[in-house]
Regions:
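Conserved small/polar residues in nucleotide/adenosyl-binding loops
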Residues: 1-6
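Cytoplasmic-side transmembrane-helix entry/capping segments in multi-pass membrane proteins
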Residues: 9-22, 38-48, 64-72, 151
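Membrane-interface helix caps and helix-loop-helix hairpins in membrane proteins
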Residues: 30-40, 60
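Transmembrane alpha-helix/helix-exit interface in multi-pass inner-membrane proteins
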Residues: 62, 66-92
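Membrane-interface interhelical connector segments
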Residues: 89-107
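Hydrophobic alpha-helical transmembrane segments
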Residues: 103-126
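Interfacial loop-to-transmembrane junctions
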Residues: 133-157
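Juxtamembrane boundary at the C-terminal end of a transmembrane helix
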Residues: 162-179
């Protein structure tokens, strides 16, 4: 019995690694070559959607769910950036000189503290939290721990985005966005 549990755990970890690798590869491609073009972010990140959709019914279910959950988180972030008006800062920040980029990133962060963008940001965060909670509770049509894992991936997006915003406000040079 322990051998099967250990084997299943190893299989699950391998599957999660495959899903993470798909997300990581897409991010590397975008941030490495196309980062100045925010309109390309989601299409590049979605390169493996056909493979992931096919994997939902087979042994790669965890990998596919991880990748798709990460993609949904990315879509939520991009939508919130567009809705708050901060997307307009993106090309300037990532193409600015090293001495100008932190100032531009800080300006983008402070833009989010204005009333309308802040309300939009809070509503967006609440919607993501509610979606994550729903996935976690009833597994959103998933079986076993897959729904909980999808919820964790989605909610982790909020943590990462929140830390990035905090960094942009307090110490823009440490955000990881500026080379």
């Amino acid at each position: 019995m322990c051998i099967r549990d250990s084997s299943q755990t190893t299989s699950d970890l391998g599957s999660l690694l495959v899903g993470f690798s798909g997300s990581w590869l897409a991010g590397c491609i975008f941030w490495g070559w196309l980062r100045a073009h925010p309109v390309l972010h989601l299409p590049v990140e979605a390169f493996a959607v056909p493979v992931a959709l096919g994997g939902l019914q087979g042994r790669w279910r965890l990998a596919a769910t991880f990748y798709l959950s990460s993609l949904v988180g990315t879509a939520c972030t991009d939508l919130a950036m567009a809705a708050t008006g901060v997307m307009q800062f993106w090309p300037a920040v990532v193409t600015a000189s090293l001495d100008q980029a932190p100032l531009l990133l800080h300006q983008a962060g402070t833009h989010l503290l204005q009333p309308l963008p802040l309300i939009t940001l809070v509503i967006s965060a609440v919607l993501v939290l509610l979606a994550g909670r729903r996935l976690s509770r009833n597994s959103g049509g998933f079986t076993g721990d897959v729904g909980s894992m999808a919820a964790a991936v989605l909610i982790t997006t909020l943590w990462v985005d929140g830390l990035f915003l905090l960094s942009a406000l307090l110490q823009p040079g440490l955000s990881g966005l500026i080379e």
